[in-house]
Amino acid sequence: MNYTKEQIEFLKSLDFMKLGQAINRGQWQSAAMTIRRLDMKAKEVGMQDFERNFTGIRQSINRKDGTEAKQILAVVVNKRAKRLNLISEETNK
């Protein structure tokens, strides 16, 4: 699959790391703002398949359920890593 420059930038975004840090530290307001930013950017670049995961993270943040938020974030990070690996493989061909 060919990714646009904007999609690659989204996948490389430091917001994923910031979200994990905010959740780990129990900084719920920061986590909420970060997931909102990630969700908006995903929609903007046409990566709707993250939407369900982001909704789950947002709901977990609203309940201040760090364990659930971390579990869903792990799924998102795995999906993101797979895509970045595919992009890297395509680039190195």
Predicted region positions:
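Alpha-helical segments in soluble extracytoplasmic regions
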Residues: 24-28
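Amphipathic, coiled-coil-like alpha-helical segments
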Residues: 1-21, 41-93
